[in-house]
Amino acid sequence: KLEEQRNRDLPPLVAASSPEEYDALAEGAVERIMHFLREKDIVTVADTMEPALRAHMGSFIPEDARHFFWITAHYDPAPLFTHFWHWFELARMDTRPHPSPIRQGALLYNIFDSRNEGTATGVEEMFMHAGLYDDSPRSRELVWILLAQRAARGLGSLYAHANEMTMEEAGQVHMDWTPRGWMKTEKELLIFEQHLYLRQPGYGTAYVTGKYLLEKTLADYARQVELRGEEFELRDFFDRLNAPPDRSQEHARRQAPTRSRLTFPRRSATLTWALQSVPEGVALRR
């Protein structure tokens, strides 16, 4: 609501009404995101990133058939496309697999759900604050709506897991607390998501709790850098987030005597969370 108040004198976004209009929006969103990441020093852009994003640009969907995510994308695909950080990670794992054979393949359960969903959800808002929508203030409203939907979805799933609500009642929370009634347009997505998260306790909430952990990690990392008298750079943070683990450093820590080990700076729990490498093939959701 505060974002809408800020933008009250601006014209509203207009949804794409034809394949040509959607394709133009999607192409513009990809170009805008990649330019932003590269020119604003957000992250070192690998050759695999733009092709990975282009492979998931989507296509025009008639208004009466759009579910929540594609409703937002037909106004501006960029907020949803930033969540596609997932595809950047999967492309990187294809070209730079984890050195440990134990962590190269898919696990029976995606224990990294908080890491990957939290990061994908977190960068949506981080990129907004870093200036991605400075030339399209109304698009900021979509970022908040996407986050509100994840929060409503996760809250409903918590009630269901606690046996305080049926899945249908949890879905009602999901619908009622998503802004603009955009979860009431297409019931298949609602049923699918509530069923998915009912079967995986903690997954539905991981989008929001994982986002918090990413933000906490950013704060912890920035403080560590500044305490060393160095200048914080956002690109360094995301590059380290994307980097494979330094196995030699970890090995040295394990082999060092106890007294020497104390000389290493303590790594916060959130930093450890963020620096996990996600195994290839894990399930990734919007």
For the regions a protein language model found, what residue spans apply to each?
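Long, His/Glu/Asp-enriched segments that create or flank divalent metal/ion-associated functional microenvironments
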Residues: 1-286
